[in-house]
Swiss-Prot record:
It holds the Pfam family Ribosomal_S11. The gene is rpsK. Keywords: Ribonucleoprotein, Ribosomal protein, RNA-binding, rRNA-binding. The lineage of its organism: Bacteria, Pseudomonadati, Pseudomonadota, Gammaproteobacteria, Alteromonadales. One of its GO terms (cellular component) is ribosome. Located on the platform of the 30S subunit, it bridges several disparate RNA helices of the 16S rRNA. Forms part of the Shine-Dalgarno cleft in the 70S ribosome. This is Small ribosomal subunit protein uS11.
Length: 130
């Protein structure tokens, strides 16, 4: 019986990306931060819920800050230095996520609000009575 040659474990080479894009999706319940390259391929991501916050603590600015720091540190392995930020949604973690990415050491070149605005599409949820 022929012996199958064993594959030696090879170290995977990470591609080096100088410029990236940070997509921040800030909803009322959670904040999702994805860092991609210029083509939109995801390099790293983090969420408030995945960072250890559950329930109503997910929707705090501090949870968004922690998630942005985790995504930012993970993307530094790819050599990302400059970020273009796209913010979507009305959530409380919008500004704190941008500040956290800045504090990690990224040079933020542009901030764009890409929140979808309906041209009178679906009926919005009813107003809360607290």
């Amino acid at each position: 019986m022929a012996k199958v040659p064993s594959r030696s474990p090879r170290k995977r080479v990470r591609k080096q990306v100088a410029d990236g894009m940070a997509h921040i999706h800030a909803s009322f319940n959670n904040t999702i931060i994805t860092i991609t390259d210029r083509q939109g391929n995801a390099l790293s991501w983090a969420t408030s819920g995945g960072s250890g916050f559950r329930g109503s603590r997910k929707s705090t600015p501090f949870a968004a800050q922690v998630a942005a720091e985790r995504a930012g540190v993970a993307a530094q392995d790819y050599g990302v230095k400059n970020l273009e930020v796209f913010v979507k949604g009305p959530g409380p973690g919008r500004e704190s996520a941008i500040r956290a990415l800045n504090s990690v050491g990224y040079k933020i070149t542009n901030i764009t609000d890409v929140t979808p605005i309906p041209h009178n599409g679906c009926r919005p949820p009813k107003k809360r009575r607290v």
